[in-house]
Amino acid sequence: MKPIIAVDLDGALLQSRPFNEAHKRWFYVMSVLLEDNAINEYANLDDYFSKVHEVMRRYLGNVDSETRVKFARNLFSMATIAEVTKGDLVEDFVGYLRGLKEKYRLALITSAPDVSVEPILHKVGCSDLFDILYNSPMGKHPNKRELFEEFVREYGKPIFYIGNGDKDIISSKELGIPAISVNWVSQGEVKGDYDIQKVSEL
C-alpha cells in the first residue's frame, strides 16, 4: 500500500478568499431572511459560531443543535461553491501534487462541509487529484482534530500533513503526524516540523 500524504483545502490547495467571502455572504443572507442588518456584524467576530446558533434559533425555532448546524453548513456550502473559481487554485501546488501520485496516495482532510468538497474540486479542475476525501459531516461543528483522529483510525498516519500554519498544524503534531506549514496563501502563526514559503521548497 502506498504511503499517504495529507493536504488541507483552505490555505494550501486554495486561496482563502472564497471561504472568507462565503462566511460574509452567509451572515448577509440571514440578515435578509430575518430582516435584521445587525446580523452582518457577526461575520467580524472571532467567536462567530455562537452567533450562528443564535441566528439559527431565530430562524428555525427550538430545534436540536444538529439540525441548526446542518442548516447553517448547507447554506455555507452553497455560498462557498458559488464563490470558488479556478483563480483561487494554487496551480503550482497542484502540479507538485500530481507529480506525487505515482508513489503516494493523496488525501484531502478538510473541515469544509462534506457536501461542498466534491463540487469545489470539480469547479477548479481537481476532481481526480485525491485518492481519499475526508470531510466534516454536515451536522457537526467542524473539528479538525477529530477528523485527524478518525482518519488515523481508518487509514493510518499520513507520512506528512501539508497545511496553512494554523491550529490544524498543532493537532497534526500532537497526533504524531509530521506537519509541513505553508505560507503561500497567508503567513501562518504556527510552524510545522517544516515551514516553507513557496511550493518550490517542498
Sequence positions of predicted segments:
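Short, acidic loop-to-helix structural element flanking the phosphoryl-transfer center
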Residues: 80-108, 118, 145
